[in-house]
A protein has these predicted regions:
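Short amphipathic, positively biased membrane-proximal segments
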Residues: 1-153
C-alpha cells in the first residue's frame, strides 16, 4: 500500500465526495430545480436564498453511506469517476448531449417561472429532470460496466 501525503484540500475533497455519496444527499438535491422554480414563480427571494444555501451545504450534511449499493450513491461515484478521468460533461457525445439539452430546458423553465406561466414551468421542469436522470443513469451504467471490467481502476 502506498502512503501519500495529503493536503487539507485533498482531505476536504475526499470528505466532500464521501458524504455526498450518501443517497439522501443526492435525492434531496433532486428537489433543487423545482424549489428554485417555485421561489422565482412566487418571487420568494428568501426561499430562493435558502435553496441556494441548502444546495451548497447539502453534500456535507450527511454521513458517508454504509455501502455502495444505492443507485444514487453510484450516481455520485460515477460523477466523481467522470471528473477524475477529465471527461467533460458538456459536449455532443452521448450521454453528455443530454446535459447540453438540459441547459435550454432548465433555462426556459426559469424564464417561464419568472413570467409566471405555470404550465410551461411544469412542462420544462419535467423535461429538464428527465434529461438529468437520463444523463446520470447513463453515467451509472458506464461506471458499473467499468467496475465489472476492471474493479481496481
Amino acid at each position: 500500500m502506498l502512503v501519500e501525503e495529503s493536503t487539507g484540500s485533498d482531505d476536504f475533497v475526499s470528505t466532500f465526495w464521501r458524504r455526498h455519496a450518501n443517497s439522501k444527499s443526492g435525492w434531496s438535491r433532486t428537489l433543487t430545480l423545482p424549489a428554485i422554480l417555485y421561489a422565482v414563480y412566487h418571487r420568494n427571494w428568501r426561499f430562493l436564498a435558502t435553496v441556494g444555501v441548502f444546495t451548497t451545504l447539502n453534500p456535507l450534511l450527511f454521513s458517508p453511506p454504509e455501502d455502495e449499493d444505492a443507485w444514487m450513491t453510484r450516481v455520485v461515484f460515477a460523477e466523481r469517476w467522470c471528473r477524475e478521468k477529465r471527461q467533460g460533461v458538456l459536449d455532443f457525445s452521448y450521454p453528455n448531449v443530454l446535459n447540453v439539452l438540459n441547459i435550454p430546458a432548465a433555462g426556459y423553465a426559469l424564464f417561464a417561472a419568472y413570467r409566471r406561466q405555470p404550465l410551461r414551468v411544469a412542462l420544462m421542469c419535467v423535461v429538464s429532470m428527465v434529461l438529468k436522470f437520463w444523463f446520470v443513469g447513463a453515467l451509472v451504467r458506464r461506471y458499473d460496466a467499468r467496475q465489472m471490467d476492471s474493479p481496481r481502476e
